[in-house]
Amino acid sequence: MASKEIKFGRTAREKMLRGVDILADAVKVTLGPKGRNVIIDKSFGAPRITKDGVSVAKEIELEDKFENMGAQMVREVASKTNDIAGDGTTTATVLAQAIVREGNKAVAAGMNPMDLKRGIDLAVADVVKDLQAKAKKISTSEEVAQVGTISANGDKQVGLDIAEAMQKVGNEGVITVEEAKTAETELEVVEGMQFDRGYLSPYFVTNPEKMIADLEDVFILLHEKKLSNLQSMLPVLEAVVQTGKPLLIIAEDVEGEALATLVVNKLRGGLKIAAVKAPGFGDRRKAMLEDIAILTGGTVISEDLGIKLESVTLDMLGRAKKVSISKENTTIVDGSGAKSDIEGRVAQIKAQIEETTSDYDREKLQERLAKLAGGVAVIRVGGSTEVEVKEKKDRIDDALNATRAAVQEGIVPGGGIALLRSSTKITVKGANDDQEAGINIVRRALQSLVRQIAENAGDEASIVVGKVLDKNEDNYGYNAQTSEFGDMIAMGIVDPLKVVRTALQNAASVASLLITTEAMIAELPKKESAGGGMPGGMGGMGGMDMM
């Protein structure tokens, strides 16, 4: 086992604080509308330019093991906030640094770290209650656009794109952000349910120019097994032919003789038909087939349920106004499933999302939910260079997450004003002087955001804080973009409550742990072994005459 180095008390906390400061100082320059960029060197390709706090934090690794521990703890604050709220990483980092700094001073002055922690926890709970009381629910598209614009560092177009996407696919819909091949940023909305399986044969195509198969007013047969011959399907095929309507087969696979027979019938014009593979794998495939069945009002043909292909009737088939199939995707628009059944399925998937502990499963369940409840919107990010596209994509991702958070829990005045106002509303009392000191640490830390935003904008922080607090109005604050004072919500400067709340709770949680740390253990660097000397020369070659 390698030797360890141990540091105690004040020495340990000073090292840790230095690490916290290095990381936080690099992250906090990005805060606010006039925050600066950070350039990150990459081992290959062009350097990355970003204003995203968590991207900066993730790149920082310090040489000194003890300093690095402090930095990594604060990095954890940024990552956790990003995971839960999707934004607010810089806010969380600035708050954590402020609480650790103030807490360290109090510990150095001889106060009890555990009582300080209790005081911090009491104050944070009080502030969260105050924030929740003054949060404003958002309902209009304009308010959604405002939140998106703020999170994208004042880019109005991004805010409008996100608002439009949310309007079209609903709050439950999936909105993805991709890199475009052009210089323009555009929004594409896929209505209905889309899954990533295309036609099994190009002969099913009805539009040779676009290479897509469009089927209108279509019957949909859902089968969970492979189809290799059509003998057992003949009764239902004949029934569909009688109606004169097209048929889409969704099965695990359609192969060999079955596929050949379908293609021949399609080419002869006797049968308007297309076949695609079912989406997903294993249990997820079964669940997705069930989703499609509920959306289209059909039944999944499954031997588990005792249904055989021979006994399938027309009323077991799903129906949809339109199905569009490309080489890679199938989109079902306007399925004829009962609204109550779809709502029941949506509620069931929401319950599964609440219960699951796996991020991957949660993501897949959310995709299924979106396909049933709304649709899918894709924001394609354009730009002149790869570096510009990546930077813009980072901002749009942040803005999208912030907007979703705002819809969930509502908004509060932005620019750090909500926390600054809450610092004057903390009414909770500590059980002793040390707990009171913990409460005061939070009071002072809550000013740090407005101070940092003002500093980044080149204004005098103390004057800004003083001016804001002089006026006793909840929404009155400081607009760093224009250096003006006024009603923050009227100016469109808002923050999602979920982001502010999560940032504060995570910052206080990690900062409390750092304050109550008394010892740090790190592995000693391995000593390089001294390099071997030069190999000895050749021994004498006795007995030989030299010519």
Curated annotation (Swiss-Prot):
Residues annotated as binding ATP: 30-33, 51, 87-91, 415, 495
GO biological process: protein refolding
Catalytic activity: ATP + H2O + a folded polypeptide = ADP + phosphate + an unfolded polypeptide
GO CC terms: cytoplasm
Domain of life: Bacteria
EC number: 5.6.1.7
Protein's cellular compartments: Cytoplasm
Coiled coil: none
Transmembrane segment boundaries: none
Principal location class: cytoplasm
Nucleotide-binding among keywords: yes
Function noted in UniProt: Together with its co-chaperonin GroES, plays an essential role in assisting protein folding. The GroEL-GroES system forms a nano-cage that allows encapsulation of the non-native substrate proteins and provides a physical environment optimized to promote and accelerate protein folding.
Recorded family membership: Belongs to the chaperonin (HSP60) family.
Protein name: Chaperonin GroEL
